[in-house]
Structures are given as C-alpha cells and as structure tokens.
Design a protein with these regions (language model features):
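Solenoidal tandem-repeat scaffolds enriched in leucines and small polar residues
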Residues: 152-200, 204-205
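Helix-turn-helix repeat elements of alpha-solenoid scaffolds
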Residues: 49-58, 85-91, 136-144, 172-184, ...
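Catalytic glycan-binding domains that act on GlcNAc-containing polysaccharides
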Residues: 70-73, 78-82, 91-107, 112-113, ...
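N-terminal leader/linker segments that initiate helical-solenoid repeat arrays
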Residues: 26-76, 107, 125-166, 170-173, ...
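N-terminal secretory signal peptides that target proteins for export/translocation
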Residues: 1-7
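Bacterial N-terminal signal peptides
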Residues: 10-21
Length: 580
C-alpha cells in the first residue's frame, strides 16, 4: 500500500443498536437482526452474569429460576463452573455440561478441567466440538531478520546452515557478538553459507555490536558484511549507519544510510528507516533539498514506523478509508439460523460482547466464504474489536484487502478514557490484539496486559496478586487500571511525560528503563534511544505503538503534535497524559 497522500479521509463508523424484543422478532428494518430473548430475560441474564462474576452463586441461582428462556444456560453454567474462587466443580458437573454444551466456546476449558477431576476408571467426558478460531490479529513487524537458509532446495546441507545461523543468533542474544563473530569466521562453517547469507549474519553481528555500545566494531563488522554482498547486506548498512551516527561520524553515517535508502530491494522497514536517517544527516549538513528527497522515500512506506514519521514531518495526511462493508440480508438470515448465532445475538442483547465474540469464533470455519466481509463488519459494528481485528487480519492475508475500520477497531462509545484515546487503542492493539481474555506466559492479563503485581500496586489492593487476578480480564477494570498505570509512568521523574520512555517502561519495565537511560549513550535523542534499547521486543513495541497512534489519531480526527515533536528531535507531547 504505497499510494500517495491527500487531505481526504473517509470514516464511516455506525453502531448497530440491539433493542430488546420478543424472540425472534426483528430489531428494525435497518438492522434486521433478530432477538432471541425477551426484555425481561435479557435483563435477568445480565444480572446473573454480574452476580456470578462477583461470586454470588446463590443469589444468581434464585434469578435463574425466573428465566423463561434457557438459551444462555450453557454460558451461565460455564461461568459458574470455571469461577476461580466461588465454586468447585465436580467431574459429574463438568461431564454433564459437556454432554449438553460441547459446542460452546468454553468447552475446551471445561474439558481440560474435567480431565483433571476425572476419577480413576471413569469414562472421559465428551470432547469439545472442533473448529474454534483461536488467536488474535497480528501486528506488522517493525524489524527485519533474514531467513537462513534462504532456500532448502538444491543445498547440500541446509540443516547445517540453519544450525550455524541459530548458533550465531544465540550468541548475540546472550550478549556475545564476538562469540558470534568467531562462529562465522570458522572456515568449516563458512562453506555452508552463501555470500548473501554470510552478509545477513555479519550484518546482525554488526547490529549487536551497536546495541552493546561498541561502535567501532559495529562499523568494522558492517563493512565486512557489505564486502560479502553489497546487494544483500541490509543489516550491515543499517548497523553501520546507526553506529556512525552515535560516534558522531556523520559523513560515514550518511554514506551507509543513503546507500540503503536507494536500494529498491531492501525490506520496507529498513529502507524507510535508512531514508529517514539520511534525511537527518542531510539536515545536519544544511542540505534541505537532499533531506526532502530522502524524506519522500521514507514516506512511501506509511505502515512502517519511520514512514509514519516522514508523513508527519512533511505535514501530509495519509488517505485512509475507514468505511465498512455492508452487511447483507443473506448473512443475517444465515446467522440467525445457527445455534451459535442465536446465542451470540442473545449475548449482544445482554451486553456480553466478549462471550458473543467467542460464540462467533466457532462459526467462522463453517460459515460460507461469501460472508467473510459481512462477519468482519458485524463484529466491528457490535463492539467485538478482538474478533474484528483477527478476521480482518486473516482476510488481508488471504485477499490483500485492508479493511481499516476492523484492522484498527475502536472500543465501545461508552468507554471511559482518562488518557488519550488514540494512545490507549494503540497500546491495546499491540498488547492483546483487543482480546480481553489474553494472557501472556509472564501472566500479564487482559486488554492492556497488566501483570497482577502491577495491578495490585496501582489499585493498592493485594488481592489482584491472587484471588482477584481473574478480574483483570474484565475490559472495564483492565482499562481503568491500565490508564492509571500510564498516568503513573508519565509522572515518574525519569520519564517526565516523555512518550517514548513511557512506552519503554510499559513494555520493558521501569527498572529496565532506568538501567537503559543510565547505560545507553542516546544523546537525549528519542530516535537514537529507541534504536539503542537492547531488547528487540521493546524496540519493536515502541515503533508499533507509535505507528498505530498515527492511524488512530487519523481515524479519530485528532492532531498529532507528539509525533511532530519526535520528528523534530524533541520529547513527546505531554498532553497525551490526558484525554483530548
């Protein structure tokens, strides 16, 4: 997507309001979405879910007796059986549930628990229905690493080549670029590498030397990479330019950056970055025309971090269409005819968007392909951003079509933002892909991926470390604590409103940020700080969030002063600390 820029930006954001009606009457001529719960039952289910979430199982049981429809009882019981503190489920409870509701989205979790509770010699519970769509939408990478071996075909020992690359990268990860250099200089290893593969790996070693602050060795390794293959040593040019800039050898930096910026075969993220830094070099030498030419190259890659910065520096608006596909009558009829679709529509009546989205994930595999765009639009309009993002990402991979309103979804209009909305959305997109039930290996939970210890500190409530940690999957609570944590970080003396530093602390931890600020020679330059951070995940995180911030501010019609400040080499706009 490299079309030029204009002032026009279309944004069509319509919300389908689901008003209650006796099942299954139509909502309205415009929506044509059937309801399967009466107003009384919708309200009762809403109360039941809330009571059970708080552990009030007996009070919820009294309300269950007043229901006319049992359409959502599978969800009610799964919430009860999976509650972490208020109920201990027996194998019989779980087995009976699976015999009735194995097509529900909680079936896999119930099955796992039933296997743990199964008495010796007892028959296993019924298996969950297959076909559930797992996963979240994936973010565009903001870094580059070559595939080695470049090809497995026609090679004498491709496995050996892969192992050499693995050993070199392991040495780099462990902080030993010189050890990596020893591996690649071993003649018995070199014979398994093509010239371009050697150039790629030597470029990675050069970048490692830059990361560890050894700029002279970084430049030397960069030159060795370029000598092996001038057309493929992308990381060599990149690392050589960064190391030369930090060493204040600006003419040499310009040579590295300009060469990479003019390589049409270079990866987008590196070409955009090199062009942006070539612009900075030219401005330092008082060459505005040359600077503009390189800024224009960077701006042709608006989905990269440096492309975003270039667009902002040039005062351009990237033309983005935020309209959604129309939802067809055929899709509405099909959805209402599916048992899972009926439950999803009922859950939308209740206002339980997370459970509704999970029901729809079971329908994706059996849905006619012609309805793919319908479901994307339906999920986007009905407050299911995680599902919308996941489906739009898959759709983009399959067809190349970018449905931006789903790739960059919004939250409910009822969401309470106390920090800049675009910033919060950008962080959520990067952290969890808008999936409220997301949980990392490190135990970070929910939309904003909060650690239990962080939540306990921010809320001043130790229960979030243990008995209340499951509550972090509640979107409202997670957003509240996450925004409070952002405000806390921005107020820290060593961050002092700096957006780049705040993002580094949010991802890498405040302690690591303190260490990086002490040890890194970043010369109070935001871009150099980003590139110098040792943790690749944190570098990519900052670049990703700032790129998404650009698109969300565009979508919301907000100004972008913080990005312009970054381009000018200043600190980020501190007005992001409060909602605008």
């Amino acid at each position: 997507m490299r079309n030029r820029f204009g002032l026009k930006m279309a944004m069509l954001w319509s919300v389908l309001t689901l008003s209650a009606a006796v099942a299954p009457a139509l909502v309205s001529a415009a929506d044509k979405l059937p309801h399967f719960l009466s107003p009384k039952d919708a309200d009762t289910y809403r109360q039941i879910f809330a009571l059970q979430e708080d552990g009030e199982i007996k009070a919820a049981a009294m309300l269950i007796k007043t229901l006319d429809s049992d359409l959502l009882m599978g969800h009610v019981l799964s919430q009860k059986y999976l509650h972490p503190t208020a109920w201990r489920s027996s194998f019989k409870d779980l087995s009976v549930w699976l015999s009735r509701y194995n097509d529900h989205p909680s079936a896999s979790r119930i099955k796992w628990l039933s296997d743990k509770r199964k008495p010796k010699g007892a028959k296993s519970a019924k298996a969950p229905k297959q076909g559930y769509l797992n996963g979240v939408g994936l973010s565009r990478p903001q870094s580059y690493r070559a595939n080695i071996p470049e090809s497995w075909k026609g090679r004498s020992a491709p496995r050996r080549t892969a192992n050499i690359a693995k050993e070199i990268r392991r040495a780099i990860r462990r902080g030993h670029p010189s050890g990596a250099l020893d591996i690649i200089n071993n003649k018995s290893n070199l014979r398994y590498l093509t010239a371009s593969e050697e150039a790629h790996l030597r470029g990675e070693i050069a970048h490692a030397y830059f990361i560890f602050g050894v700029d002279d060795k970084a430049v030397r390794a960069a030159r060795q990479a370029i000598a092996k293959d001038t057309e493929q040593a992308f990381m060599g040019y990149w690392a050589g330019g960064l190391a030369s800039w930090r060493a204040e050898r600006f003419e040499l930096a310009g040579s590295f950056f300009r060469t990479l910026a003019e390589m049409e075969n270079a990866p987008d993220v590196l070409r955009a970055g090199a062009a942006f830094w070539a612009h900075r070099v030219a401005m330092r030498f008082g060459q505005p025309l040359q600077a503009d030419s390189y800024m224009n190259i960077a701006a042709t890659y608006p989905e990269t971090f440096y492309g975003v910065m270039a667009v902002q520096a040039a005062g351009q608006r990237y033309e983005i269409d935020f309209s959604l596909p129309a939802i067809t009558d055929d899709f509405r009829v099909w959805l209402a005819a599916q048992k899972g679709g009926q439950r999803a529509l009922a859950l939308l009546q209740v206002g339980n968007w997370t459970r509704a989205a999970r029901e729809l994930r079971y329908l994706v595999e059996e849905m006619p392909p012609a309805f793919q765009r319908d479901l994307i639009a339906f999920a986007t309009r009905n407050h299911m951003p995680g599902l919308a993002f996941r489906l739009a990402d898959l759709h983009q991979r399959d067809t190349g079509e970018q449905i931006y309103a789903a790739l960059y979804p919004l939250l409910s209009e009822k969401t309470d933002f106390v920090v800049d909305e675009a910033l919060v959305l950008a962080i959520i997109r990067k952290e969890s892909g808008f999936y409220p039930l997301a949980r990392s290996r490190a135990r970070a939970a929910g939309l904003m991926q909060l650690m239990p210890a962080t939540a306990a500190f921010i809320a001043q409530d130790r229960r979030y470390r243990r008995t209340h940690k499951h509550k972090l999957h509640d979107p409202t609570l997670n957003l509240h604590l996450g925004q409070k944590y952002i405000g806390h970080l921005l107020a820290e003396p060593h961050i002092n409103g700096d957006l780049v530093r705040m993002l580094a602390a949010y991802n890498g931890g405040p302690g690591n940020l303190n260490k990086w600020l002490r040890k890194l020679d970043h010369k109070d330059d935001s871009f150099l700080l980003i590139e110098s951070i040792p943790a690749r995940e944190t570098r990519n995180y900052i670049k990703g969030v700032l790129s998404y911030l650009f698109i969300y501010r565009n979508q919301l019609g907000q100004p972008m002063p913080s990005l312009l400040d970054l381009v000018a080499g200043q600190k980020a706009d501190r007005r992001l600390a409060s909602s605008q």
